[in-house]
Amino acid sequence: MTSPVENSTSTEKLTLAEKVWRDHVVSKGENGEPDLLYIDLQLLHEVTSPQAFDGLRMTGRKLRHPELHLATEDHNVPTEGIKTGSLLEINDQISRLQVSTLRDNCEEFGVRLHPMGDVRQGIVHTVGPQLGATQPGMTIVCGDSHTSXHGAFGSMAFGIGTSEVEHVMATQTLPLKPFKTMAIEVTGELQPGVSSKDLILAIIAKIGTGGGQGYVLEYRGEAIRKMSMDARMTMCNMSIEAGARAGMIAPDQTTFDYVEGREMAPKGADWDEAVAYWKTLPTDEGATFDKVVEIDGSALTPFITWGTNPGQGLPLGESVPSPEDFTNDNDKAAAEKALQYMDLVPGTPLRDIKIDTVFLGSCTNARIEDLQIAADILKGHKIADGMRMMVVPSSTWIKQEAEALGLDKIFTDAGAEWRTAGCSMCLGMNPDQLKPGERSASTSNRNFEGRQGPGGRTHLVSPAVAAATAIRGTLSSPADL
């Protein structure tokens, strides 16, 4: 838990992001120089940490605060055939070396690690929250773009490069210039069947993949306040897809209830002190944002992507756009390129697009609520002929929770594959990949060319749309069943 610094009693009206930043400035930059910001927690995985550990080793430096680092194995781990967590269960030699190196580095430098075979293992952005390591008011970094997910707790969380990972290891600080602030005001309430994934995809389509560049986004409004923590994590997770540095949601009782009692959460009097501080974090009435964007949540329907970046999205009820629908020359050219790669014909109803693989997984949408939503839709159904559906929980803990609820049986009875935890098909760095020309409906966060395997074509969807699509064989919502 981060304690407020002396100047936190200022009467200046501040946003949530500005308060967290203020309370972490070790030294303020002068004449345009960056501030030196204290980092409360650094999360590590097997892909972006080896070079940083090597840097410490080569310079003879120690890890300044091992207790403020937390590691797990996620990006390259297989999601089938894992029984003991042995390195021998990883067939790919490069992946095996990366996982082995992480284990060796964590042992040498005293970092807490949750490896394959550990019930607490999983995708790093699920592990932090489930352990209670992620808390309101923190600064959190990781060598991974989707660190922004932790902002759902009212923390300022963002991805960093490997050289910065090493800098945090050595100093527990980062030199940074303050980010601009943007309020995303969601008016109205989401309709039944519309999820936080639909909302964030609609936001990205509205402001564009560069619309949030240089900003911290704060998601606000009644629809946000009514969301569970799982849903809020989905929102903040995809802030980076709008170009933002981070995404945040003000902590409230929903946040406190989620964190309380978890292994690394404060206890007793420390808990009371923490909550008292956390309650001071929400944006002050009258605080000014650098930019405000409004979106009518009540008007939203299930939303998907049709192209090759997360901003190329439309309501599921619409049709594949034509490049001529775009007035901006860059958007027109991007649409032409995307349509060619995705092998789509303008005017085709999105609901007519045939899907080969449904992937229910990733740090965006593979928590227990996501699995429950999909299982409720799949119950009593079979997936379409020729369809492959992979269900990959985002942590072993969630996998066991789902199995205790019988969700695994619902998935397997429907014909889906029930896998072990990992990043899986979100990215083509492990055995779970699309074949060239295959098309997926994926609950992950990126639909770039080749993201899920060379030549693979990705449509980003919500868990509900994923489940309905698996049943019908074409992009579908539960209303189509």
UniProtKB/Swiss-Prot annotation:
Pfam families per record: Aconitase (PF00330)
Q: What is its EC number?
A: 4.2.1.33
- Uppermost EC category: lyase
Superkingdom is Bacteria
Which positions are annotated as binding [4Fe-4S] cluster?
A: 363, 423, 426
What GO annotations for molecular function exist for this entry? Answer: 3-isopropylmalate dehydratase activity; 4 iron, 4 sulfur cluster binding; metal ion binding
Mind listing the UniProt keywords for this protein, alphabetically?
4Fe-4S, Amino-acid biosynthesis, Branched-chain amino acid biosynthesis, Iron, Iron-sulfur, Leucine biosynthesis, Lyase, Metal-binding
**Cofactor(s) listed:** [4Fe-4S] cluster
> What does the entry's cofactor note say about binding and number?
Binds 1 [4Fe-4S] cluster per subunit.
Q: In which pathway does it act?
A: Amino-acid biosynthesis; L-leucine biosynthesis; L-leucine from 3-methyl-2-oxobutanoate: step 2/4
Please name the InterPro entries in this protein's record: 3-IsopropMal_deHydase_lsu, Acnase/IPM_dHydase_lsu_aba_1/3, Acoase/IPM_deHydtase_lsu_aba, Aconitase_4Fe-4S_BS, Aconitase_4Fe-4S_dom, IPM_dehydratase_rel_enz, IPMI_cat
Q: Which reaction does it catalyse?
A: (2R,3S)-3-isopropylmalate = (2S)-2-isopropylmalate
Q: How does it assemble?
A: Heterodimer of LeuC and LeuD.
By sequence similarity, the record places it as follows: Belongs to the aconitase/IPM isomerase family. LeuC type 1 subfamily.
Role this protein plays: Catalyzes the isomerization between 2-isopropylmalate and 3-isopropylmalate, via the formation of 2-isopropylmaleate.
Please give the name of this protein.
3-isopropylmalate dehydratase large subunit
> What gene, per UniProt, encodes this protein?
leuC
